Amino acid sequence: MNDVTTETYETLKQSVLHTFAQLTGYNVSELSLTSHLENDLGVDSIALAEIAVSLSRQFQLNTPLLIQDINTIKDALDGILQREFQLSEKVEPAAIALSGDADLWLGNLVRQIFASHSGYDVNALALDAEIESDLGIDSVSVASAQGELFNTLQLNSETIIANCNTLSALKQCLAARLVQEKGQDWFEQRGRGQSDSAIDHDADTTAEVTPPTATPVAINAEIGDPRTMRDFVGIEHPDIFHKAREFHLFYQDKKKRQLYFYGMPLETPCKNRAVMFDEATGQHREFLMFGSNSYLGLSNHPEIIHAIQDAASLYGATNTGCRIIAGSNVLHLELERKLAKLKGRDDCIVYPSGYSANLGCISALTSRHDLVFTDAINHMSIQDGCKLAGAQRKIYNHSLTSLEKSLAKYADHPGGKLIVTDGVFSMHGDIVDLPRLMKLAERYGARVLVDDAHSTGVLGKTGAGTSEHFNMKGQVDLELGTMSKALSGLGGYVCGDGDVVEYLRFYSNSYVFAATIPAPVAAGVIASIDVMLREPERLAKLWDNIYYFRTRLLNAGFDLENSDSAIIPIVVGDDAKTLFFGRAVRARGMFCQTVVFPGVSVGDARLRISITSEHTREDLDEAYAILVASALEVGVPVNASAHQEENASVAEA
C-alpha cells in the first residue's frame, strides 16, 4: 500500500471536515470521521449530493464522488485519497518520527507566533486546545500566523495549511512539510539548538528572507481575477502596503467588469426609490432602493428633520468633546432616558456608534479571566469587542444546541461568563430564540448581551426590539443597539441596570475617550422614537411588506434561509455567481447589497434585501420580477412557476 504523509492526510482531512461543516451547519469539532451521515448526523441524500459535488470540484477529481459510496465522512476522505493518489485500498496517515527536542522546538515556535497574533500569553496556549472554539482565534489571525511561520521557517510552499483544529495538528503538518523540503537532519539540528537566522527572532532577516511572490492566476474572460477578498488578508511581505497594491489591482478589475459597486453615492434622499451615481456606467440613475436600513421610513420624516434643524440652531453643530468632560448636552440625557424607557431598563449610555458600543461594553465588563460565548455569525463589532477585552472567546455554531454544549463544557469555569448574540442576525435575517437562550444563561450562570441593531423599530408590538417580541421586556441583562437604522440617526447605546451603566461611563474606553454624537443628531433620534410610538401604522406596514415579499420569493424557490425580519437574504453560495446576480439586478434598476467575504464566509455569498415601510406593492412586484429575471439570466435556481411568469411577462412586453 502507498504511504500518505501526515501533512497530506491531515490537510485533506481538515478540508473535508470543513466542507462537511459548512454544508451541514455543524461545527468541525462536532464531526467525527466515523459518524454515520444519515443515522448520526441527519444528513439526507439531497445534502449529501451537494457535498459530493462540492468535494469533487474542490479537489478537481477526474472521477466524481458517488453518494452511494459515502456513509461516513471517512468514506468521502478515502474516496478523495484513492482518486488523488490512485490508491487501491483505504489509507491511514504515515507518522513522522521526531526526537523530543525537535518536536519541542517546533511546538514552542508555533505557540510563540500564535501568541503574537492572538494577544495570548504564550504560556496560556495549550497545543491540544481547539484553535477556534477553545481559544477563539479567528481564521484571519490563523492565516496571518501561518504566513509568519512559513516565512520564519523559509518554507517554499505558499499554500495555507487548511483548517487544523489544534496547534498540535498544525505542528504535525509543519513538521511533515519541513522534513519534505529540508530533510530530517535539518529538523533535528533545530531541536538541538543549532538554529540559523531564519528562526532567530532577534535577528534582522529582512535581507535573507525572500518574500512570497504572487502566484500567477489564469484570468477568466468573465470573472477576471479569480481571487476573493479573503486572499488579501494577512499577506506576508516586507512592505505592509503590498497587500493594498495587490487589492487595488483586484478591485479595479472587479469594478471594470461591473461586479463590485460598493460606495455608490446617493444624489437624492434615500426613500423607496433614489437617484444614485452609477460609477460603473457613469450614469445618474433612479433605482428601486432595497439597500436602506431606514425600516420605518423615518429618515425623511419632516418632524425629525425639523427637530435636527432646530437643535442645530439652538446648540450648534457639535459639542467637540467627550461626554465626561464637556461633551454632554441636555439632549443626550433626554435621549438616554427615552431609550431606557423604550427598552424597559433602569438606565442607558449613548456611544458614538453601534460599533463602539459593542467594543466599549464588552471590553469594560470582561477580562482575561472571563469567558465570552459568541455566535459564529454575530456582527463583527461583537467579535472585535471580545478580542479587545482579552477574554477567552468561545465561538459557538449558529445554533443554541452548540451554545449549550459549550456552556456545559465550561460549566465549572471560575471566572465570569457572558453570552453575546445578535437579536436579528444582520446578514441572515433570522431571530435569536431568546427564551431558550435566557434559560441556558440562567442554568449556567451567565450574563446576556443582545445586540438589537436590526431589531429596534422592527420587532415587538411597539418596535422596542427582541425582548418585547418575546414578551421578555426588561429581562435581558444588557440590550445594545444602534440609532443609525430604524431610528434614522447616528450612535449606539447600551441599556441595563443603573449601576452597570454607571460603571460603563467610567470604564468603557470608547465612551470615555471619544467625542459624542452631536446634539442635533440626538434631537433627531428623540423625535424618531416619538414618531415611531405615535404612528404604529408604520410598523404594521413594514410587516405587511415583509410577509408579502418573503412569500413571493419563497414561492419562486429562492433560498431565504430562516429569515423572519426586514432583512431577507437570497443565498447563492458561489462568489462569482453572486457577483453576476448582483450585476444583473443592478442593471435592471434595483439596488440591494451583494454580500461576499468578509460580510459572510467564502462560499456563503448572497444578495441582502432590506424591506422598509416606504415600499409600495408596486415596488415589491417590480423587485420580484427583477430578481426572477436576473436569476434566470445567471443560473440561480428558481422554480418552474417563476420561470413561466417571467416568460409571460417577456411575451407581453
From Swiss-Prot:
One of its GO terms (cellular component) is membrane. It is a single-pass membrane protein. Its EC number is 2.3.2.-. Its main location: membrane. CDD domains: KBL_like (cd06454). It is found in: Membrane. It comes from Serratia sp. (strain ATCC 39006) (Prodigiosinella confusarubida). This is 4-hydroxy-2,2'-bipyrrole-5-methanol synthase PigH. Pathway: Antibiotic biosynthesis; prodigiosin biosynthesis.
